[in-house]
Amino acid sequence: MVEALILGWNPEYEPLKGWILNAAVTTKIFIDIFIGVWAFILAVVWVYWIERRPGEKVEKVEIWYRFPKFVIGYFLTFVIVAWLTSAAINAYAASLGVSVSELTTEQFKAAYAPFSAAVNEMNSLRRIFFALTFFSIGVISDFSVLRKEGLGRLALVYFVCLFGFIIWIGLAISYLFFHDVHLLFLK
């Protein structure tokens, strides 16, 4: 929807259709890695200072058990996809006898076309797995226990933090990384 509004106000950006999604995905990966760093810090603090009993020796593997492993997946996925994309675009530019910075928008799109095709093929699987994820969470959740523990207030705090803090950080990160990206592609 945002992309449609931007393209409606700025028709000259039409060649960049899809860049907002790419920027959003990259920002999401950065934010998830940032969350992973804080999750690691919290795991260390929790293991060594909050749950540690006097005289008890804490094993370092306990931090590994508490660390959210999905962060490693995000990081590796980001690095692998960035490397593959860069290698493919560099190879395409080399086959034309030019540097990547000399590629026109059409040539850049042609170099990126195999990745766009792969993403289009994976979109149906992405939707299915996304639905299965939330279905699974709903199936295994015992909401009566959550209600009894008073986690409704925690959900309210999360909601307030999300809209009062987290979204603004995401917007700031997006702006810092992507505010002039369209200028790179509109030659």
Swiss-Prot record:
Subcellular location: Cell membrane
GO cellular component, one term: plasma membrane
InterPro entries cross-referenced by the UniProt entry: UPF0324_pro
Domain of life, per lineage: Archaea
Transmembrane residue ranges: 29-50, 70-92, 128-147, 154-176
Keywords: Cell membrane, Membrane, Transmembrane, Transmembrane helix
Membrane topology: Multi-pass membrane protein
Protein name: Uncharacterized protein AF_1618
Lineage: Archaea, Methanobacteriati, Methanobacteriota, Archaeoglobi, Archaeoglobales
